[in-house]
Amino acid sequence: MKQIVFISRRLSVALPALALFAGLSALAAPATAEVSLSIQDRDVTRMISLGGSCNRCELSGRNLAGATFTGATFTSATLVGADLRGAELVGSNFSGSDFSRANMAGAELVGSNFTGAAFRDANINGAEAQGAVFSRADLSRANLSGAELMGANMNGAVLTGANLSGAELFGTTLANVSARGASFANAELNAANMAGGDFGAANLSSAQLDGARLSQASFGRAVFTDASLRRTDIRGADLSGARGLTQTQISQACGDSSTRLPRGLSVRSCGSRGMVRMPSPPAPPAPPAAPSPRRDIASADRH
C-alpha cells in the first residue's frame, strides 16, 4: 500500500513537469524535428554499418554521406533523393531498392548487389563499382561518367539516356541492355560483352572497344567516330545505320555474313582468323566478411 501511495505522489509531481516539457517542445518543434532527423540518420549508419539489415526501409532524402555499410542488407529499400556521396556500400545487398535521384557521387559500391534496383536520374559520377551487379537495374538518365565498373554485371540493364562518358568498363557485361541515346564517349569498353544490346543513337565516339563482343547488338544511328575496334567481334551486329565508321576501323574487327555494315564497308570473317582475346579484367577486391547478422532496425521508418 505504501508503495502505491509513493508511486502516486511521484506521478503527481512528474505530470505537471511533463506537461510543461511538452509545451516547450511544441514551441521548438521545427528545431526538434531537424535534430531528430540528424539523429536518425546517424542511428541508421551506426546500426547497419556492420552486417545489419534494413529491408524495405524508407530512407528517402536522408543524409547518409560518407556512411559505411559493409555486408548489409537493404532489399527493396527506398532511398529516393538520398545523399550517399562518398558512402561505402561494400559487399551489400540492395536488390530491388530505389535510388532514383540519389546523389552517389564518389561512392564505393564494390561487390554489391543492385539486381533490379532503380537509379533513374541518379548521380553516380566517379563511383567505384568493380564487380558490382546491376542486372536488370534501371539506370535511365543516370550519370555514371568516370565511374569504375570493371567486371561489373549489367546484363539486361536499362541505360536509356545514361551518361557513361569516360567510364571504365573493362570486361563489363552489357549484354541485352537497352542503351538508346546513352553516351559512352571516351569510355573504356575493352573486352566488354555487349552482345544483343540495343545501342541505338548511342555515342561511342573515341571509345575503346578492343576485344569487345558486339555480336547480335544493334547500333542504329550510333556514333563511332574515332572509336577503336581492334579484335572486336561484330558477328551478327547491325551497324548499317551507324555513323562515323571507316573501313580502317572495320578492318581491325571481324564479323560474318550476318554482320550489317554501312554501304561501302566490308569486314573480314572471324572464321579461322581467330580472335586474340583480351586479358581477363582484374578481380574486384573481396568485401570484408560481415559479422553475425543483427536484428532489423526498429528505429527506421518502414512501409
Predicted segment positions?
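Tandem repeat scaffolds
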Residues: 2, 8-11, 29-302
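Bacterial N-terminal signal peptides
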Residues: 12-26
